Amino acid sequence: MGRVPCCEKDNVKRGQWTPEEDNKLLSYITQYGTRNWRLIPKNAGLQRCGKSCRLRWTNYLRPDLKHGEFTDAEEQTIIKLHSVVGNRWSVIAAQLPGRTDNDVKNHWNTKLKKKLSGMGIDPVTHKSFSHLMAEIATTLAPPQVAHLAEAALGCFKDEMLHLLTKKRPSDFPSPAVHDGAGAGASASALAAPCFPAAPPHHPQADDTIERIKLGLSRAIMSDPSTASAAAAAAAPSAPAEDKPWPPGDMSEGLAGMYATYNPAAHAHAQAQAEFRYDGASAAQGYVLGGDGDQGTSMWSHQSLYSGSSGTEEARRELPEKGNDSVGSSGGDDDAADDGKDSGKGAASDMSGLFASDCVLWDLPDELTNHMV
């Protein structure tokens, strides 16, 4: 439920008050006073609302009110009080005898506000416009504004460097997932992915690889068992020769080695190498003794070729040379020296076959590329 209206709006007069209405209201209040504003309009014979009668009495008909223009002293008081309390018009009017809050508000909005603006003073803050502009400039432009451009440029450079060096997910190799024993390796690969870089190209390394391949091909062709089997399979009806491989298309250096190769000397050198006395072992003493005064070193049983078993001729000569060396009671020193010299000469001939540019070992292309 709302407040009960003070009068019926249908029979209420609106608009400006006439002098007759002012006289009726003034004579009634002077005689009966201001007791009940709801009954005053009816008792005074006015077709006005009770609120309208109250405002007309308070703001215009009271005997202690001042009518007319505000003095300079009153205006200065209003300006000072407004700078302190703001738009609290009732408080300001209480400091001005004979002036109502409505009169003070109307005078401020119609005259004093425009007057202050014309003087270069803000009517809200009561400060000069130049002072306000200085405060705004100080607030919006801190002392660090000179370094803002440099700082922004540095941030831009850092961001661009980050974007250029950032790897996309498509650049990362996707690790393959295997079952069984490879599950742990796959998990570790997923946890710590690696980014292998392509190895640089070195022409010198390519030349070294080619030399290694050439040495391997020469070593395979110089192996008696492999070369004999290949020759027998390739040409079973070919005439027997002293060399274990057939002369085919070969380089000039390989043809020279093919012409100087002697299988008998090769077998003799291998037999001497298997039963020769090592110099270092002879100086240190023999660990394996025979029937005679001479022994065999534990390092002397080394073959000139890794994995080579010699020829049939070397196998036949092997027991005979062993019996001769064991049966003799000391032997002829010259004969022994001659045998050693011949063995060393044959070994040196065969060692020349594998010069520094001939390497016996090679790796597949995949491992070779990775190693380079």
Curated annotation (Swiss-Prot):
InterPro entries: Homeodomain-like_sf, Myb_dom, Myb_TF_plants, SANT/Myb. Residues 312-323 have a biased composition (Basic and acidic residues). GO terms for biological process: anther wall tapetum development; pollen development; trichome morphogenesis. GO terms for cellular component: nucleus. It is found in: Nucleus. The keyword Methyltransferase does not apply. Residues 9-65, 66-116 form the HTH myb-type domain. Residues 37-61, 89-112 bind DNA. It holds the Pfam family Myb_DNA-binding. One of its GO terms (molecular function) is DNA-binding transcription factor activity. Residues 298-347 are annotated as: Disordered. Residues 298-311 have a biased composition (Polar residues). Keywords: Developmental protein, DNA-binding, Nucleus, Repeat, Transcription, Transcription regulation. Essential for tapetum development in anthers and microsporogenesis. May regulate the timing of tapetal programmed cell death (PCD) which is critical for pollen development. This is Transcription factor MYB80.
